[in-house]
Amino acid sequence: MAASTAAGKQRIPKVAKVKNKAPAEVQITAEQLLREAKERELELLPPPPQQKITDEEELNDYKLRKRKTFEDNIRKNRTVISNWIKYAQWEESLKEIQRARSIYERALDVDYRNITLWLKYAEMEMKNRQVNHARNIWDRAITTLPRVNQFWYKYTYMEEMLGNVAGARQVFERWMEWQPEEQAWHSYINFELRYKEVERARTIYERFVLVHPAVKNWIKYARFEEKHAYFAHARKVYERAVEFFGDEHMDEHLYVAFAKFEENQKEFERVRVIYKYALDRISKQEAQELFKNYTIFEKKFGDRRGIEDIIVSKRRFQYEEEVKANPHNYDAWFDYLRLVESDAEADTVREVYERAIANVPPIQEKRHWKRYIYLWVNYALYEELEAKDPERTRQVYQASLELIPHKKFTFAKMWLYYAQFEIRQKNLPFARRALGTSIGKCPKNKLFKGYIELELQLREFDRCRKLYEKFLEFGPENCTSWIKFAELETILGDIERARAIYELAISQPRLDMPEVLWKSYIDFEIEQEETERTRNLYRQLLQRTQHVKVWISFAQFELSSGKEGSVAKCRQIYEEANKTMRNCEEKEERLMLLESWRSFEDEFGTVSDKERVDKLMPEKVKKRRKVQADDGSDAGWEEYYDYIFPEDAANQPNLKLLAMAKLWKKQQQEREAAEQDPDKDIDESESSSF
């Protein structure tokens, strides 16, 4: 008992007795201390030796040491969550999911309010496809921290991505019980609308406007009903909003939106009553926008019809004068048609359109037709969207296509717009017939692409193949088409067919972007893990071009293959490239190759390999050359930089002479310096001759 008591007491250190209290002979200042500390900071510590793990025992030892390090860091400061996350991510990188899970759980015990910790934990489970574990984590997170919106968003997004619509809806319902901010409600509504659940979205809006009873939210609710053509419901929403806010909290924006809705429904008397009711109860200072919109409405439909008629008639007369003076002023026709569409009857609008399209450009050049063709586009869109007359829309498209001189030029947009219209009318054969006619009359890249895109959306892959074949017959130099065709076959799983397409493509005598095609072919073979085929492709490409980027890419491919001897093969490629490019006129490309080689040796080579490449690096020298003007006269001299490679210098006598001249100049400078210094032996300068 006495021993334990004595051990438990703290030992008090003995006070050192100072024998000599006189000041030291050499005093150390604070400045000296700081200088020494700074000098020690500049000392470079050697990097720790790289450890290469060769067997399981060493791996286990490495894991044990790393875990001990992480545990020590955590023990020092448990509240630093980044240490926990790094520890868990390290365990995850080793596929030790259970250990990572345990670490996250321990971290949550330390700080369960840390948002990042929950997110990293759940993301780990999702990344490893542990869906149920991820669900449990999200469930715990939203239960523990229900006011963190990020948890709810990610939880619902995960459920939706998994196709669990009912589960996502259940999560949203739990979220709404907490009455979150407005954006959360909008997310729920948009979720339901993505699955065409209009009735559910309406129910959510009903709850939303009660939780967040702002004017803008009531307006959004009404516009939602209007957008889905529930006009009676939209009117009821506006009426409920007016009743909800009453006379004490009236807002002009609500009444403006209500009036515009009724205006769109052509209920002009209702519009007038709404404006008058609001203006009678809202002060003029707060009703500027309301009064402005009422004035515009009255100019359109109300008692001020005479004023409106004068304004419209004046503008119409102005446009008539402009189009009479220059019938081919298509901008004036556009303005005129915009005015007529906003005010006149459908027959009047059609009459003006017919007058406008009658002014065909006199010259059959595409640049003169670009503005004119949009008259036909707008005419067709008006008939389809405003007049709701599909038959007349079809006639407009057909008339425009008959008018265009397809032998000289065409407008792919007109063919595509027509085909899209027929698809909207569910006349797929008509759309195909139109596009087939277009590529028969006037084949064009945009037409082929549009037709192929249509058939792809319809999953008609055989038709896509035929279209690609015709496309490539029309433009065999188009590399993009070859690549897209091969990618289609790859997606369909026909690898041999895709390879045959690539072989046909690279055998073409003329290509617009051959480098893109070759890269795509090489990437395709790499994806198929055909190492030998890829190597042969690089060899074929190097027979056609000796570009430095091809050599570098070839070397990097050999290095990335991961097979035994890949480093040696990569080095062999660099050596072969260096030998090949000795006669290359572009010295910058040769320098680029050597720099890439040096980077490779820095990472994988030995000291001798690095020194060998360093010896091949060129010297940068400044030179002068004559410059000639465009007329052939002498324009003086210009300086430029050139590169002298050691291999070239050894084979050129003039470069040897230049090196000797530099040495002689250096010796001359040393002799002059020696003559100026009397303490130096003057006889040393006599050795300057060569």
Curated annotation (Swiss-Prot):
Q: Which Gene3D superfamilies match?
A: Tetratricopeptide repeat domain (1.25.40.10)
The UniProt entry annotates the motif Nuclear localization signal at 618-626
Keywords, sorted A to Z: mRNA processing, mRNA splicing, Nucleus, Phosphoprotein, Repeat, Spliceosome
* Subunit annotation: Identified in the spliceosome C complex. Present in a spliceosome complex assembled in vitro containing CRNKL1, HPRP8BP and SNRPB2. Component of the minor spliceosome, which splices U12-type introns. Interacts with PPIL2 (via the PPIase cyclophilin-type domain); they may form a trimeric complex with HSP90.
Compartments annotated for it: namely: Nucleus; Nucleus speckle
Mind telling me which PANTHER family this protein's record contains? CROOKED NECK-LIKE PROTEIN 1, PRE-MRNA SPLICING FACTOR
**MF terms per GO, please?**
RNA binding
Function statement: Involved in pre-mRNA splicing process. As a component of the minor spliceosome, involved in the splicing of U12-type introns in pre-mRNAs.
One GO biological process this protein is involved in is: spliceosomal complex assembly
What's the protein here called? Crooked neck-like protein 1
Show me the HAT repeat boundaries: 61-93, 95-127, 129-161, 163-194, 196-227, 229-264, 266-300, 310-342, 344-378, 388-424, 459-491, 493-527, 529-560, 565-606, 608-646, 648-673
